[in-house]
Amino acid sequence: MNPMNEVQISKATVSIGVGEAGEKLSRAITLLEQMFDQTPVKTFSKVTNPEFGIRKRQPIACKLTLRGEKADKAIEMVLEGINKNIKPTQFDAQGNLSFGIKEHIDIPGMKYNPDIGIFGMNVSVTFEKPGYRIAKRRIQQKKVPAKHRISKEETMKYMEDNFNVNYVTE
């Protein structure tokens, strides 16, 4: 196979949406730091929503972006939390994968800590092929050609080969 056509992981993003600022958000930040040995960033609300008690630019969630070897280890770890079962509908047309974990204690090695509590999280994995830099660079920025874009099937095969995932239909 041509090495320029090999699918690789660009990044893995893990986020916890708390919905409020304060103690609960700081506990979610502590949890992500403990799980991935990296400091997460806070994300802020974009609009005011009085029904939920949210004001504009109020911190309501935290997220973490992992790249390289850290991303591979993190994906392997969180896939164990869902027993490596993925639905084909969790892949989008560009070949990205997104799934949720209901409780972080489902992940092997994670223990319940009463000081932190239980949090669910969203995991998004972005894939790319070598040469995707042309779309991100500053000078002479171009689109990735259609024949070089990643399809859903390519990503599904990559996950099956490298992470031994099972595809469930439900």
From Swiss-Prot:
The molecular function terms in GO held by this entry are:
rRNA binding; structural constituent of ribosome; tRNA binding
The UniProt entry, under Pfam families, shows: Ribosomal_L5, Ribosomal_L5_C
On the tree of life, the source organism's domain of life is Archaea
Biological-process GO terms, alphabetical: translation
Keywords on record: Ribonucleoprotein, Ribosomal protein, RNA-binding, rRNA-binding, tRNA-binding
Reply yes or no: does the keyword Ribonucleoprotein apply. yes
Entry GO CC: ribonucleoprotein complex; ribosome
Q: Which InterPro entries match?
A: Ribosomal_uL5 (IPR002132), Ribosomal_uL5_arc (IPR022804), Ribosomal_uL5_C (IPR031309), Ribosomal_uL5_dom_sf (IPR022803), Ribosomal_uL5_N (IPR031310)
Q: How does it assemble?
A: Part of the 50S ribosomal subunit; contacts the 5S rRNA and probably tRNA. Forms a bridge to the 30S subunit in the 70S ribosome.
The UniProt entry's sequence similarity note says: Belongs to the universal ribosomal protein uL5 family.
PANTHER family named in the record: 60S RIBOSOMAL PROTEIN L11-RELATED
Q: What does this protein do?
A: This is one of the proteins that bind and probably mediate the attachment of the 5S RNA into the large ribosomal subunit, where it forms part of the central protuberance. In the 70S ribosome it contacts protein S13 of the 30S subunit (bridge B1b), connecting the 2 subunits; this bridge is implicated in subunit movement. May contact the P site tRNA; the 5S rRNA and some of its associated proteins might help stabilize positioning of ribosome-bound tRNAs.
Descriptive protein name: Large ribosomal subunit protein uL5
Species for this entry: Methanobrevibacter smithii (strain ATCC 35061 / DSM 861 / OCM 144 / PS)
Q: What is the lineage of its organism?
A: Archaea, Methanobacteriati, Methanobacteriota, Methanomada group, Methanobacteria
The gene it comes from is: rpl5
